[in-house]
Amino acid sequence: MGERCTVEGTVQSVVFQNEENGYTVLSLLTEQGEVVTVAGCIPYAAPGEGMTVTGVWITHPLYGPQITCEQVERRMPREEEEIVSYLASGILKGVGQATAERLVERFGTDTLRVLEEEPERLSQIKGITAKKAMELSKAFRELTGLRRTMEFMARYDLPVHLAVQAHRVYGAQALQRLREDPYLLAGQSFGVEFSRADEMALSMGFDGDSPCRTQAALLYELQHNQGNGHVFLPREKLLWAAAQLIGLPPDRVEMCLDTMVEQGAIRQEQVAGVLGCYTPELYEAECFVANKLLSMLRFPYGKVRGVDGVIEEMEMTQGIRYAPLQREAVTLAAQSGVLLLTGGPGTGKTTATRAIVHLFEKMGLDILLLAPTGRAAKRMGELCEREAQTIHRCLGMSYNDLTGRVTYKKGESDPLEAEAVLVDEMSRVDLPLMQALLSALRPGCRLVMIGDADQLPSVGAGNVFSDLIRSGRIPLVALKEVFRQADKSYIIRNAHLVNGGIGPDLKTNQGDFFFLCRRVPERMVSTVVELCKTRLPEKMGIAPEDIQVLTPTRRGECGTVQLNRCLQAALNPPSRTKNEKQFGDLIFREGDRVMQTKNNYDVLWEKDDGTMGAGIFNGDVGTVEEIDPSGELLTLRFDDRTVGYTADMLNQLDMAYAITVHKAQGSEYKAVILLAAPAAPGLLVRGVLYTAMTRARELLIIVGDDTIPGQMAENDRRTRRYSGLRRRLKEGGTQA
C-alpha cells in the first residue's frame, strides 16, 4: 500500500458524494474486470461514465483498500448501456430509469449530444414537455460545463476542487470567464498564487502587458501586503512592487492603476501627506471603525450615580485598595461609551477589569467578555469568574466560498444582545475583526478595550489598538504603577526594564526568572531539550505540556523547524504503540503538540459535553490523540474540543513544541523558555522580547547569547504599518 497507480475504467456505482465540495467515493470497473474503490474530488460522478484515475493506494480502516484520487480524466459514456446507466443514476433531476431508456431508444449513442445541443427534440419523447426539455438541457449543460472546467484545471495541474469553486462563483460562465481572464484564480475566491496564475495565462497566449495581468498584479500586491499588516500602500510603493512583479515599467502600470481607481476597484486617498491605495474592503472597514467609534462617543449614555459608593463597597468586600488610576478606569467605564485600558504586567489591569465587570453587574447590564484567541478567552473567564469567549465564535464567523471572504452571523441587522462588551488582548485585534465587532454592537452598548500597547501588533492588517490610543479621541487610562506584590516577580521587573529600553538583569537567576548563557546554537538547542525533558519536570514539577518554547524565527539552527525536530524526538519519540503519518518534512505522531496555521471555518468539532460547532483558527494549539492505521484520518484535541482531520488537511498543521513569538501573541503559559539566538535584524527588537517575556505566567528561562537580550531591548525599531485609522479619528471620521 502507498503505491502510486493509474487505472482506467467505468464507474459502476457511486457510494458517497458531497455536492458542496465534490468529495466522492465510487466503485470503478477497470478494463481488467476488477472493481476498485476510488475516493477524492470527482464532482457529479455517475455510473456509466469513463475515467482514468491517478492516485495512491491506501487501506481505509473501515472500507479497506482504495485509491486516493489525485488527478482524474473523465469521458462521457459512449455505449447505449452506459448512457442509460448514466442518465438513470439521478445525475439529472426528473430522469429515471424509464425516461433514460426511452431517450436512448430514440436517440441512441447521440443522446447526450441532443441533450446539450438540440433540446427541442427531447419533447418527442412521451412525458417530456417543451418546458421540461429546456430544463433538462440546461441542467445537462451545467454538468458538462463543470466537467470541461475540471479538464481545463487538470491541463494546468491545478486542483480539481477549483473547478467546483469556479462554478459556485461564476455558474455556467465559469470556463468562459477563466479563459478570458485566468488571473481571476489569483483573487480571494480561489487563493492561487499569482506566479502560478501568471504562468498559466502566459502559456495560454496572454500578452505580458495585457490589462488583466497588470490589474491582477496591483490587487495581488495590495492583498499580499495585508498579510504584512498594511491597510493601504503608498501609490509609489504599489506601482513599484507591481512593476517588479510582472517586469513592466512603472509608467505602464500607472495607466492601469488610474483606470482601476476610476472604476472603484482600488480606492485612493491622501493619508498624512501620502497618496494611499486601498482595496475597497479595507477602505470601507477603516472608515466604518472610525465613524462607529466616534458615534459611540457621541451617544447620550446618561450620568451613572453612585459609582464611588460601588468602588468603596468592592474595596471593603475584597479587602483591597484601588489605585487612583484604577478608580478612574471604573468611573470612565460608567460615564463613557468607549474606554481604552492599557498597561504592562503587574500594573493592575486584571484588578481594574474585574472592578469594571462588577460595576456593570451592579448597573444591571448584560455583559459579554471577549478575546481574540481561545487561550486568552479562557484566561479572561477564569480571572473575571464569568464565561468568556472568542470574538470569532461570539459573532458566528463562517467562510463564504463565493467571495473567498469571512462572514458573520451577527452584525448591524442582527446585533448582539449585550449592553456592555469587554475585549481583552486588544493588540491582537486586526482591522477587519474590529469592523465585525463594532458592526455587531447595538446603539448604547458600552465597549471597554483592554491590552498592552507595547506588545507586537496583530498578525492581520492594521495597528488598531495603537491607532486608537495615539488618536487622542478615545478615553484612555494607562496604568503604569507596578504593584508591590507584582514587583516581587522578576519576570515583571525585567519586562518593565525591557520596555524602558534597558536589557533584563541576566544575573537574577532566582524566583521566576533565569538566564542560561549558551553561545553555540547546538548547545542552546540541547539545553532547551534537556530543560523540557528532564530538568523542569524533575526539579520543578512542571510537566512538558505546561512548557512553551519560544523563538523569534522559524529558520536557522535555533528556529522553530529545527527546535521542533529535536523536541519531538526527545519528548515523543517513535514507538510501536503510536501510529504516525508523514506529510512532507513532518511526521505527525500520536501525542504530538501541533498548531493550526490557517483559519479553517468549516471543520467540525465536538466538545466533551456533546456541543457541536465549526471552526479551528490560526494559532490554536492541540494534541494528536489518534491516527488511524491507514494514516488518512487524525483525531486532534484542542482544549475541550475533538476534531477529525483528513490527510489533505495536514498542510494546515505544524509542530508546536516550539513556536515563534508572533504566534504566541494573546496566549499565556505556565513556563516559557525563550531562545536568545542570532536572527534577522527585524526580529531582534524590543517588541519581540517584551512580548515573549510577558507570555510567561510562573517561570521564564532565557537560553542563549548574553549580548542579545540587551541588544533587543535597546532596538525599538518598529516596522511601519500603513494605516489611516488614527488620522480618521483625529479628523472626525470620513465617509466610505
Identify the residue ranges that each predicted region occupies.
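Conserved helicase motor core of P-loop NTPases
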Residues: A453-A614, E625
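C-terminal accessory regions
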Residues: N618-A736
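Conserved lysine of the Walker
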Residues: K349
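N-terminal pre-P-loop "Q-motif" helix
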Residues: G319-Q335
